[in-house]
Amino acid sequence: MSEEQNLRPVYDDDQPGEDTYKRGAIYKQTRSRKADYEDGENSEKRQKPNDTDNGPTAVVTDLSNEKKETRSKDKDESVALAVDADGNPIPQEVRLPKRKVAVMIGYCGTGYHGMQYNPPNDTIEKELFEAFVRAGAISKANSTDLKKNGFQRAARTDKGVHAGGNVISLKLIIEDPEVKEKINNELPDQIRVWDISRVNKAFDCRKMCSSRWYEYLLPTYSLIGPKPSTYLYNEIEASKKEIPNVIQDDVESAQFWEAFSTEAESKFTKEELEEIAAFVMPKDSFDENNETYQKSKAFKKLEAEHKRAYRISKERLDRFRSALKQYEGTFNFHNFTLGKDFNDPSAKRFMKQITVSEPFVIGEAKTEWVSIKIHGQSFMLHQIRKMISMATLITRCFSPLERIRQAYGQEKINIPKAPALGLLLEAPVYDGYNTRLQEFGYDPIDFSKYQSEMDTFKMKHIYDKIYLEEVNENVFNAFFSYIDTFNPSYNISQEQQQLKGQELQQPSQAVELVTEDLEQKAPSDPTPSDEKGKKPQRPIFDFLTARGIQLQD
């Protein structure tokens, strides 16, 4: 058995259940273990003499030395049973004490399949565990099983998601005063250990975490309204004519797209623009030197540059902030995750505070960004990405802000996930439990002591990679362009084929992810079903238009 196969992951379901802490439960477990131990000793006393014994006197002997020898022998055999990945016995080490600790870490998730150990994939936990072993913080005898070390995590991050601060708890050998430096020397530069702090034996970094801070970085051009002639734009305009005074006119977006149209007409002839509009990317192989393809590619590049030059107005930014404020409080977020029903009590979550920074310009592309910080008690799968997506769509489409509160209702709504690229875990918070730690004589778990180091790390290994990947892959541009051109009445439009082929020479993860959310139904089915098939899901497009809003009312 290989080391990777033998190294068992620790899942959140491995946590002790609530019944473990009910009155009398621990006593019963202790009594049961004691009885097993006593039976093991008494069985030796109850053994009958065999045929070679000379009567009863053979039984009446002092077994204390015999027991010690047996235990010593068993101990030696247990040490010999510890083997490496190739099945060879691991040489006996000097046994050093293990201490329960909280390890404060930060990492860039690019290139990893998430936080949690998941063989054979490369994950953050896999890198950490192997570094602990190489640095001597975990003995070789315990290097094949995470559970032997009581491994737990405060927050599990998905593939590609980063963390400025996260916490894991486990038992480590920390006698060496330079153990933190040795561990960091064994880790890649994109994973850092900020501190290793002693905690009491009952500490559980996930259960004792009172809340979590997340950050999401968003380019401000994502808040521009849909491009004229796209499906979503046409639906909004048509519904406004049918039902006036429900959705406001978006003057700023109209001026933005008019300016781009003027710029495009100065770069391309009318015939070239018509040729570009009619071009469809071939499904099979094609000649990249094709003249029309090259013109289409140049057109998309011009559009991307025009978006990056956009600077958000105060009015639109305030509208976006107001949209995000609709999440503050305790609400039923069943539409903002997967596999949750309206009646599921676990769908109710408490969002403490959401803030949006002032815009800032980063990189050679001079793209303008905002930082969104979300402080919540706990979060469900994809919840933050769906929250960002809904608030952004409400801002782009000028739909009433109340639509977000209506999404907490019983109706199922298909909300696409915003790209994972901009998401990072800022830090878990231990306000309540830190008081108890200090009472036990331990230092509180506090990331503020390492804020300067963390900021430097985030800028070099997280923020810069996010900015660079957005420029190279056009992740947010692809995501919102695909949403704007998606037609629910059939699987893929000509505009979408252009997006997949021209704007991105290789389809990015953003397009693939939004496709998963939007293409959940047959072309003729106007109400897609959720993954359980229990209730129909309402398309997000219908939810945003004046027609859909009137139906809701």
From Swiss-Prot:
Keywords: Isomerase, Metal-binding, mRNA processing, Nucleus, tRNA processing, Zinc
Reaction(s) this enzyme catalyzes, per UniProt: a uridine in tRNA = a pseudouridine in tRNA; uridine in snRNA = pseudouridine in snRNA; a uridine in mRNA = a pseudouridine in mRNA
Catalytic EC class: isomerase
GO cellular component terms given for this protein: nucleus
EC number: 5.4.99.-
Record keyword Isomerase present: yes
Cofactor entry: Zn(2+)
One annotated GO molecular function: snRNA pseudouridine synthase activity
Biological role stated in the UniProt entry: Formation of pseudouridine at positions 27 and 28 in the anticodon stem and loop of transfer RNAs; at positions 34 and 36 of intron-containing precursor tRNA(Ile) and at position 35 in the intron-containing tRNA(Tyr). Catalyzes pseudouridylation at position 44 in U2 snRNA. Also catalyzes pseudouridylation of mRNAs.
Entry protein name: tRNA pseudouridine synthase 1
Native organism: Kluyveromyces lactis (strain ATCC 8585 / CBS 2359 / DSM 70799 / NBRC 1267 / NRRL Y-1140 / WM37) (Yeast)
